[in-house]
Amino acid sequence: MADSVPGGHVLLAKNSDRPVSDTQPLRFLPRRTAQAGATLRLAHVEIDDVEESYAHLGGSPYWCWGHEEGLNEWGVAIGNEAMFTRDWADTVSAVKGGADRDGGILGMELLRLGLERGRTAREALDVICSLVDRYGQWGSGVVGQPPVTGGYDNSFLIADAQEAWVLETSGHRWAAKQVTTGTYAISNQPTIRTEWDRASGDLVEHAVDSGWWESAPGRPFDFARAYVDPGTPLQLSHIRLQRSRQLLGEAVGAGGVGLGQAQQVLRDHYEDTFLGGPYFNAALPDFLSLCMHSHPSDFTWGNTAGSAVFVLPKRGEGLAHLWWTPVTPCTGVYVPVFVDAGRVPGIFAAAGTAGVRACPPEHAPVDTYDEGSYWWRFRRLLDIVKGGESAWTFNENQSVVRRAFDALERQWTAELPQVEKDALALRERGEHTAMADFLAGYTESCAQQALEVLEHLVAQLSG
C-alpha cells in the first residue's frame, strides 16, 4: 500500500508472503560498476548490465538475486506482488502441452533492477517497463517448483518523496497509474481498470487479438477485466485488497496514515470486522489475511516472510528509511534501518544453514534454522507462540509478545526524530562517514534490544 498526504511524508508498506521456510534476510548492496558490454546473469535469462548500479537495501528470499521490497540511496522504494494474468495462464497451458518457452525476468529481479537503475520513482518505472517490454516474465519464483507451478506475473508500487506509481504487468505488457495524493492498495490481482497514465503501445490490441476483450461502441477498455486470469479465483486476493482499502480509508478519516497505522494494517487478520477475526486464531486462518499464516491444510501458501514500512521524506525534512521486521509482523518488532548507514547488522543479512546465494529456485537447497540468522530467530519465536501445528497457545502467547515488542516500537518511534536531526547535522558538516557510523550504530542498538527481548520471550513462553 502507498500513502501520500499533503504536507506529510510518502509511506510505502509491504508484506512479503512466501513459503514457510523461504528465509528472507535484509541486505545492503553497495554501488557496483560494470564494464561496457557486460551482461548480468539472472535466474532464467541473461541481460545487458549498466555501467553503474545504485546502492540499496533489499529484503530477498535467500536464494534470489532480486528483492521483494527495497529502498535505494536516492530514496526510491519499491514493493511487488504476484499477479495471475491471461498471458501467464496461456504460457502455463502451452508449456504443459510441450511447447518451449524462453526464460524471462522474475518480478523480484525487476524490482532490484529498478532500485539499481532509478534515481526517481519515474526512472525506476521506466527501467522496469523497458525490461518487461524486451524480456517478458517467465520462470519459477518459488523454491522447489518448476515455472508452470512457481511462475507468475507481477504488480509493483514504486514511490519516492514526490510521487508514487502503480505498475501492473502481463507477460511483455503493462499499465501504470500515477498516485499523487491519498492512498492506494494492491494485492494479487490487477487494480487498474479503465484509467491509466502510461501503458504498452499494444495493450488493447493484444487483448482484442487474443479474444480477451470484445470492443463495443461506448465501452471503455478495462485492463483488469481483460487481463486477469479467470482460472485464478479472486478469493485469493480481493478480500485482502478490500480490507487494505477499508483500513486505509478509516485511517485517512481519522486524520491520516502514519507509521503506526501502516504497521497495524500490515498486522491485520480481520479483527474488528463482522468476521471477528479468524474463528480460532490467526495461526489457523480462515481466509488469506494481510498478515498471513500457514495453515495445516496448506490452503495458504505460507507465512508473511518479511514486512516493511518505507518512510520517504522530502530532502531536508528527514532521512529515507524503513521499519522492518522478519516473519509475521503480528509476532515481530519493526526496527528502523537507514540506507545512508551503508550497511545493516550482519545478523539481518544472514540466512540459515543454506546461506545466502543466487540460483534458480528449482536448485536451491531447503534452508533450516541457524542461530546466527535474525530471520530464523523470529521464525523460531513464531513457532513457540503457536505451540505446534494446531496453534493451541497462539492467542495467549501473541498478546504477551505484543506487549513486549510494542513498548520497543514506542521507544524507537520517540527517539527517531532526534536520531534523524543528529544525523542530518553530521551530513551538513560534510561528515558522511560519521553519519553512516552513527545510523548503523543506532540500528545495531535497536537490533540488540530486540534480540534481548526475544530471548526473554522464548524463555518465558517455553517454560
Regions found by a protein language model. Give the residues of each.
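Short, well-ordered beta-strand elements within core beta-sheets of diverse protein domains
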Residues: L111-R117
